[in-house]
């Protein structure tokens, strides 16, 4: 269910702000979004897995906090990120 090393590296390379950047809000939100999407697929087959659902809710909350932080710091970066990730339809 977790992202592979290759998937993480690809996401980091796609969303990084500078070389070696793994902690920027953009990278963190992109990684959380990928994990959330994988867990949503998991729940289609395993609807009664409530322990993993708790982890999913925690990830969604963490992503929300990071997006709120980014929106307060730089709205253009926020708008670009949600557009690239396909959030906020």
UniProtKB/Swiss-Prot annotation:
Keywords: Ribonucleoprotein, Ribosomal protein, RNA-binding, rRNA-binding. GO terms for biological process: translation. CDD domains: Ribosomal_S15p_S13e. One of its GO terms (molecular function) is structural constituent of ribosome. It holds the Pfam family Ribosomal_S15. The keyword Protein transport does not apply. InterPro entries: Ribosomal_uS15, Ribosomal_uS15_bac-type, uS15_NS1_RNA-bd_sf. One of its GO terms (cellular component) is cytosolic small ribosomal subunit. PROSITE patterns: RIBOSOMAL_S15. It comes from the Bacteria. Part of the 30S ribosomal subunit. Forms a bridge to the 50S subunit in the 70S ribosome, contacting the 23S rRNA. Belongs to the universal ribosomal protein uS15 family. NCBIfam families: S15_bact. One of the primary rRNA binding proteins, it binds directly to 16S rRNA where it helps nucleate assembly of the platform of the 30S subunit by binding and bridging several RNA helices of the 16S rRNA. Forms an intersubunit bridge (bridge B4) with the 23S rRNA of the 50S subunit in the ribosome. This is Small ribosomal subunit protein uS15. It comes from Azotobacter vinelandii (strain DJ / ATCC BAA-1303).
């Amino acid at each position: 269910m977790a992202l592979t090393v290759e998937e993480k590296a690809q996401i980091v390379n796609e969303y990084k702000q500078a070389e070696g950047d793994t902690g920027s809000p953009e990278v963190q939100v992109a990684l959380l979004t990928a994990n959330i999407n994988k867990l949503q697929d998991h729940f289609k087959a395993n609807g009664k897995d409530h322990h993993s659902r708790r982890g999913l809710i925690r990830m969604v909350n963490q992503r929300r906090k990071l997006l709120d932080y980014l929106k307060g710091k730089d709205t253009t970066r926020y708008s670009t990120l949600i557009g690239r990730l396909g959030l906020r339809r």
